[in-house]
Regions:
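Aromatic-rich carbohydrate-recognition surfaces in CAZymes
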Residues: 60-64, 68, 72-190, 215-225, ...
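Catalytic cores of secreted or luminal carbohydrate-active enzymes
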Residues: 464-506
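Surface beta-strand/loop "capping" patches
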Residues: 493-526
Length: 546
């Protein structure tokens, strides 16, 4: 186990350094015990979920990068041609099982995570060739993004998408990525935000199938579209590849123009036309599209989404505070607001608005002030997932059946809290990001209160007790944030970049802080020296501090 956890931090506080070892170990334990037979798991029968596949890879990219390439390739085999994915994961790598439910549940965030992991892999390794690896698509009874059945499918057909000629269809990983994110772009509700379907990252937002919308993940997908466009640009520059092969059915997904973007009805119609084309078999024909055309198309779509959200979803609360509405409920009403006698605010929408750069710099400042006022609770371990709605809001989700401060209803949910920190660091809000990470760490390390194994729990309750030790992906994100943002050691298409965001208190008495890790199959010990500690508090714009 000591060999397995090959990351070491030196921050001047040995208690924190040792505890970070346990957090780095936790993703290994999560793969073994998360969603398992143990009473700590929360739910499940021992299998892994779709998000687990991709978030486990995040930690492995740091600790065991050699095994990750094939995992990523195999995981893309769970994607359907309609942009959704298998939800029952087999015991073998790359094995996906048909869901026998009448209408399978669709989590609208699922298509977001694969590219997040793939992008980190590309940055860590520079292996752009993986994007051109050909992979199958998953096929079962479910079609049209969980709203219909393919009555021509049976078990004899198998669980791999076929062509009209009966052959198994293979598409590049890049095609899978484009398909996932473009289908999401068109799958919108009446407010032109992406439909919530059966839930997003918050599994307990599960009662707004008809009219629910997730502004939070509309932000997230907008960020993905821009990052995919950047990826295409780098691929053309480094490999000379200027044209991409894709299924001929996908041509309609590259439609463009403001008139289309501003019409939810036209978007839904286009998506229906596309999903009808691949409802049973695909033709098997391919088209060639220039990378420049696709890149411009993605950027145009991303910028439209971001501007739409800035114009329609921003809530001004006065006193230099404000945040984005993150959701619409099943009656089509905005979930978050600021009224004279009541405030409703949720963390998830702010995380992805900040991370995707949908939020401008002044808006990030206002979000930080609002989160500190309405969501921060030191006793409970940090930033709550939402304010107290004081109602059983079952036109949005089961989360409102939990007591406030339990599980998804306003608990300090470690995973989203760490992602909030990560987003703040990415935007240069170092002191604010540090507060998020440090408060969470202190809550976990206070064993009299947290009453848990070393690591990060799924969430902390009102009293600061940590619950469900191995379910969460928070440990992977905490380790990733410490390495790539706090210490600033990260890859850039295979090149090593060091741009630390350490605060004075994170150096030892000699003015040093250090990190041991593997990169590009080599072992590094990186020491950052700041003997003068030249300043005491970085401005929000600072990206380095040593």
């Amino acid at each position: 186990w000591t060999d397995k956890v090959n990351v070491d931090f030196s921050t001047g506080d040995t208690n924190i350094d040792n505890y970070l070892k346990w957090i780095c170990f936790q993703p290994v334990l999560r793969r073994i015990y998360g969603c398992s037979f143990l009473p700590y798991h929360d739910y499940g029968k021992g299998g892994r979920g779709w998000r687990d596949l991709w978030q486990d890879c995040l930690a492995l990219l740091i600790m065991e990068p050699s095994v990750v390439r094939q995992m990523i390739v195999d995981n893309y085999g769970g994607v359907r041609m309609d942009g959704t994915n298998a939800t029952i994961i087999g015991s073998r790598q790359g094995e996906f099982i048909a869901d026998r439910n009448n209408i399978t549940r669709v989590w609208m965030d699922h298509a977001f995570w694969p590219f997040v992991t793939t992008k980190l892999y590309l940055d860590q390794t520079g292996d752009l060739d993986i994007l051109l690896e050909k992979v199958t698509y998953f096929k079962d009874l479910q079609t049209k993004r969980g709203t219909a059945h393919d009555n021509n499918w049976d078990h004899a057909y198998g669980n791999k998408q076929r062509t009209a000629g009966g052959n198994i269809y293979f598409g590049t990983i890049l095609e899978h990525i484009l398909l996932q994110n473009l289908c999401a772009f068109y799958d919108v509700g009446e407010h032109n935000e992406m439909r919530l379907h059966g839930a997003d990252w918050n599994d307990a937002l599960d009662m707004a199938w008809e009219k629910g919308e997730s502004v939070a993940f509309t932000c997230a997908y907008a960020g993905n579209l821009k990052d995919i466009a950047d990826c295409l640009k780098h691929m053309e520059e480094k490999t000379g590849i200027s044209k991409i092969e894709m299924a001929e059915e996908m041509k309609c997904l590259l439609a463009e123009g403001t008139e289309l973007y501003e019409s939810p009805d036209r978007k839904q119609k286009l998506l229906d036309e596309y999903t009808s084309l691949c409802e049973h078999n695909v033709k098997g024909g391919m088209i060639l599209v220039s990378t420049e055309q696709i890149r411009k198309n993605l950027v145009e779509k991303a910028e439209w989404l971001m501007q739409h959200i800035r114009e329609k979803e921003w809530i001004s609360a006065g006193d230099d505070m404000g945040w984005f509405n993150g959701y619409y409920d099943n009656h089509g009403n905005a979930v978050e607001y600021s009224k004279k006698d009541e405030v409703r605010m949720m963390l998830t929408g702010q995380v992805f608005a900040v991370m995707s750069k949908t939020a401008g710099e002044e808006q990030v400042k206002e979000i930080c002030r609002s989160a500190d006022k309405f969501l921060f609770d030191q006793k409970a371990g940090g930033y709550r997932l939402n304010t107290d709605f004081k109602e059983e809001k079952f036109d949005l989700g089961r989360m409102f059946g939990f007591a406030y401060g339990e599980k998804e209803n306003g608990a300090v949910f470690s995973h989203m809290t760490v992602m909030y920190a990560n987003a703040l660091y990415q935007r240069g809000f170092i002191r604010e990001g540090h507060k998020v990470l440090q408060t969470l760490l202190e809550a976990a390390m206070n064993f009299e209160n947290s009453k848990m194994y070393p690591g990060l729990p799924e969430y902390f309750d009102n009293e600061g007790r940590g619950l469900y030790a191995y379910l969460t992906g928070a440990a992977s994100w905490y380790m990733l944030t410490m390495i790539t943002e706090v210490f600033g050691v990260k890859g850039d298409l295979g090149d090593l970049v060091i741009a630390p965001s350490l605060l004075p208190e994170q150096f030892d008495e000699k003015g040093s802080a250090g990190l041991k890790l593997e990169f590009a199959r080599k072992k590094f010990e990186i020491i950052m020296h700041n003997p003068c500690l030249l300043y005491t508090s970085p401005s929000p714009r600072d990206s380095t501090s040593s």
